[in-house]
UniProtKB/Swiss-Prot annotation:
Name of this protein: dCTP deaminase
NCBIfam families tied to this protein: dCTP_deam
UniProt-listed Gene3D superfamilies: 2.70.40.10
Residues that, per the record, bind dCTP: R97, S98, T99, F100, A101, R102, D113, Y155, Q162
Function, in words: Catalyzes the deamination of dCTP to dUTP.
Catalytic activity: dCTP + H2O + H(+) = dUTP + NH4(+)
Keyword field: Hydrolase, Nucleotide metabolism, Nucleotide-binding
Hydrolase among keywords: yes
A Gene Ontology biological process term: dUTP biosynthetic process
Subunit-level organization: Homotrimer.
Family: Belongs to the dCTP deaminase family.
InterPro entries: dCTP_deaminase (IPR011962), dUTPase-like_sf (IPR036157), dUTPase_trimeric (IPR033704)
Coiled coil: none
Species this protein is from: Sulfolobus acidocaldarius (strain ATCC 33909 / DSM 639 / JCM 8929 / NBRC 15157 / NCIMB 11770)
Length: 172
């Protein structure tokens, strides 16, 4: 079952779903919009090979700021302003807001698992021209779905509780 605006307001009021900060225009007809945060991680251009068994995080350049320019076809990791927490019977589909998709920006299919808590880090792929994004701009739209029963194994992965832009983590 997809949660509509009334459902979402009720879940937020009861504290079953937490999104902080939440703004007057965040809850939409069938989801919640999330905003651009203050950090981005750029993928450095290199001919070196990244080895997940021996991760070298110098491949990433983490930047803080109020605005960012995403270069043509550049891949970046972007953090949301909001910190969220989902109950064990709600998951969310992450979508790019249509306005940014119409500019040629792209995000891969992304799901927020039931039981997740933290800020979202999302991959964004640049358009055919540079695009400026500003902190606080509504950028993502989350569609929440309730599972028929609470999940048996709520999310407890390596990104649980993440704050700030989070580069890939590998268990060694």
């Amino acid at each position: 079952m997809i949660l509509g605006d009334r459902d979402l307001k009720y879940y937020l009021e009861k504290g079953w779903i937490k999104v902080e900060p939440i703004y007057g225009d965040s809850v939409r007809e069938n989801g919640i919009d999330l905003r651009v945060g203050n950090e981005i991680a750029r993928f450095k251009k290199t001919d070196k090979v990244f080895d997940p068994d021996n991760p070298d995080y110098s491949f990433f350049d983490v930047q803080r700021g109020e605005e960012f320019i995403i270069s043509p076809h550049e891949h970046v990791l972007l953090v949301t302003e909001e910190y969220m927490k989902l109950p064990n019977d709600v998951m969310a589909f992450v979508n790019l807001r249509s306005t940014f998709a119409r500019l040629g920006l792209f995000i891969p299919p992304t799901i927020v698992d039931a039981g997740f808590e933290g800020q979202l880090t999302i991959e964004v792929v640049g358009s055919s021209f540079p695009v400026k994004i500003r902190r606080g701009t509504r950028f993502l739209h989350l569609i929440f779905a309730r599972t028929l029963t609470p999940v048996e194994n709520p999310y407890q992965g390596k990104y649980q509780g993440q704050k700030g832009v989070t580069i890939p983590r590998f268990k060694l």
